[in-house]
Structure formats: structure tokens, C-alpha cells
Design a protein with these regions (language model features):
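Active-site neighborhood of phospho(di)ester-bond hydrolases with catalytic His/Asp-centered motifs
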Residues: 9-14, 35-40, 95, 123-128, ...
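Active-site environment of divalent metal-dependent phosphoester hydrolases
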Residues: 17-19, 41-46, 102, 125-136, ...
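Acidic, His/Gly-rich catalytic cores of divalent-metal-dependent hydrolytic chemistry
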Residues: 136-205
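Anionic-ligand binding region
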Residues: 108-145
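Short acidic-hydrophobic surface loop/beta-edge motif
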Residues: 81-89, 135-137
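Core catalytic region of metal-dependent phosphoesterases/phosphodiesterases
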Residues: 1-73, 77
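Glycine-rich phosphate-binding loop signature in dinucleotide/nucleotide-binding domains
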Residues: 1-6, 86-88, 118-120, 162, ...
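Active-site-proximal segments of metal-dependent phosphoesterases and phosphodiesterases across multiple
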Residues: 53-59, 88-119, 151
């Protein structure tokens, strides 16, 4: 990501979840990212939103909550739900979920994005689904960044997005990066849910 170069780096949330070392991930992102948004997992972690406790065997949030320092809890509570950057002719907005449901919205390639958002000059970066894709419209569009840690389409291919804005033109790109899943599974298999291991080994959509 650093090699690609950027004026700013955005993280759309969910540094916690599925794996046991969310605190380390959170600290690294706090140091790296210019914009760090709250995801639904952070919201669950600080009890901002409720979730079925039966899912905690997958999310692994309950075991991490007691380990958080007061300083980290404060930082988690202060994470914004959205980000906006406006340049000549283009308004770029970021959300973990969707513009109409910032924390828990899901946008897929076949999602009917309301016309109010598909306007010239509007561009969006979103996440939550762990599946990268691009939707385009005149002088605008939407990119789902996918996931760095747990892709749901191709498990050994992490993804992030690059947004390039020049004047009133915006280019959206998804970048895939190989994940060393054998090393990851060897390290974490005893600490993560079997469904997470299956996702890492997945080789198709």
C-alpha cells in the first residue's frame, strides 16, 4: 500500500473481530491511517450496538473487551462514522457500511443504490461485505474495498482500493495482495472459528 503512494490513507473500520489480537491491529492502524472510521465490530465492542452473543464464538469480541485499556476505549468511542473529502468537482465519502446505514449497511454488486447517491460528482468508499467491487456512474462511483484480513471471495487475496481524483474525474481501482494463509492458519487456527479458517482457504466467490 505504501508503495502505491497516496495523499491520505483511510481505514473503514473492523480492526477487531475474528482474530484474537484486535488491539495490536487497532494501534497499527491508528499510527498508519489518516482517517480511521468505526466499523460495526468496534461498535459491538464498546456496546454501541447489540449483537447475538452466540456469534461471539466467531467474532471473538467478548474475550478482548476486558483487555482494553481505558485509553483505547476512549479512542474507540471517538472513532467517526464517516469521512468526507471534497476536491474540485468530486465529493468523496467513506463509510464502513453504506451512506444510508453507516455501521451495518451492506452494498453488493447487485445492490440498487438509490438515485440520490448516484449523482455526478459523488464517489463513495465502503466495506463491511469483505467483497471488493466497483460501481460506476458519470463522474462518480462506488468502490467496496473488500478486506485486508479476511476476504470472503478469495481467501488468500487481501484487497484494498485506490481512489484517484483529478479535477472532476475520479478513477476507482481494487488492488489484490497475496495473503500467506498457511502462516496465518498455523498461527491462529486454535484461536479462530472453523468458519474463518474455511474463508481463508476459499478459492472462489
Amino acid at each position: 500500500m505504501r508503495k502505491r503512494g497516496a495523499d491520505s490513507y483511510w481505514c473503514l473500520g473492523d480492526t477487531f473481530g475474528y482474530f484474537p489480537d484486535g488491539s495490536n491491529c487497532f494501534e497499527r492502524i491508528q499510527d498508519f491511517a489518516d482517517i480511521h472510521l468505526m466499523g460495526n465490530h468496534e461498535a459491538m465492542l464498546i456496546n454501541k450496538i447489540e449483537y447475538d452473543s452466540k456469534l461471539d464464538s466467531v467474532y471473538r469480541l467478548g474475550e478482548q473487551r476486558p483487555l482494553l485499556s481505558q485509553n483505547m476505549l476512549n479512542e474507540l468511542r471517538e472513532l467517526p462514522l464517516s469521512a468526507t473529502e471534497t476536491s474540485t468537482g468530486i465529493r468523496l465519502q467513506g463509510f464502513h457500511g453504506a451512506p444510508w446505514d453507516e455501521l451495518q449497511g451492506y452494498i453488493y454488486p447487485n445492490t440498487d443504490v438509490p438515485a440520490a447517491y448516484r449523482q455526478p460528482g459523488q464517489a463513495f468508499v465502503v466495506g463491511n461485505t469483505h467483497r471488493p467491487f466497483i460501481l460506476s456512474w458519470p463522474t462518480g462511483g462506488l468502490v467496496n474495498v473488500g478486506s485486508i484480513g479476511l476476504p470472503r471471495d478469495i481467501g488468500n487475496q487481501a484487497s484494498f482500493a485506490v481512489v484517484d481524483i483529478i479535477g472532476d474525474s475520479v478513477t476507482l481501482e481494487v488492488v489484490r495482495v497475496p495473503l500467506p494463509i498457511d502462516i496465518i492458519i498455523d498461527k491462529y487456527e486454535a484461536q479462530i472459528h472453523t468458519s474463518v479458517v474455511q474463508l481463508l482457504r476459499k478459492r472462489g466467490t
